[in-house]
Amino acid sequence: MWAAVIYLTPNPPENSGTCFFKNDQGQLKGQGRGPAYKDSVLDSGSEWKPHLQVENIYNRCILYHGDLYHAPTVSYFGNSKQSGRLTQVGFFYAEL
């Protein structure tokens, strides 16, 4: 499965994109995003460390394997629907 994110916020704050993680063994892929995801990836002291950050640039589309561990690089921003983080997300299957 592939995932796509299109950033749709004009002039977003710096460091408001997407971060991909890898673990101590160099693995980028996880076992899905079940309840263990937050505990194993996002909590401090985790074996999963930030590996790559993609900046949030208006109208940029990023494509990645859907099983890569990822999260926003910072907390969501804005205090209303008009000023918050806006993205279009999609998923698709393709054989390469």
Question: Which sequence ranges carry the predicted segments?
Answer:
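Catalytic core of non-heme Fe(II) oxygenases with the double-stranded beta-helix
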Residues: 1-96
